[in-house]
Amino acid sequence: MKRTFQPSRIKRARRHGFRKRMSTAAGRRIVNSRRARGRKKLTA
């Protein structure tokens, strides 16, 4: 059986990237909460 995690930078960015987060209200809330916490990395 193959491993379930088959990394792809493009898929990762498209699903969890900054532009995807900013496209919805919930995503913007995620980014803002991470900013408030002082996260170095906001999105994938």
UniProtKB/Swiss-Prot annotation:
PANTHER family, alphabetized: LARGE RIBOSOMAL SUBUNIT PROTEIN BL34M, MITOCHONDRIAL RIBOSOMAL PROTEIN 34 FAMILY MEMBER
Span list, region Disordered: 1-44
GO cellular component: ribonucleoprotein complex; ribosome
Protein name: Large ribosomal subunit protein bL34
MF annotations from Gene Ontology: structural constituent of ribosome
NCBIfam families from the UniProt entry: rpmH_bact (TIGR01030)
Top-rank taxon: Bacteria
GO annotation (BP), single: translation
Record field: compositional bias (Basic residues): 1-22, 31-44
Residues of the signal peptide: none
InterPro entries: Ribosomal_bL34 (IPR000271), Ribosomal_bL34_CS (IPR020939)
Keyword line: Ribonucleoprotein, Ribosomal protein
Family affiliation: Belongs to the bacterial ribosomal protein bL34 family.
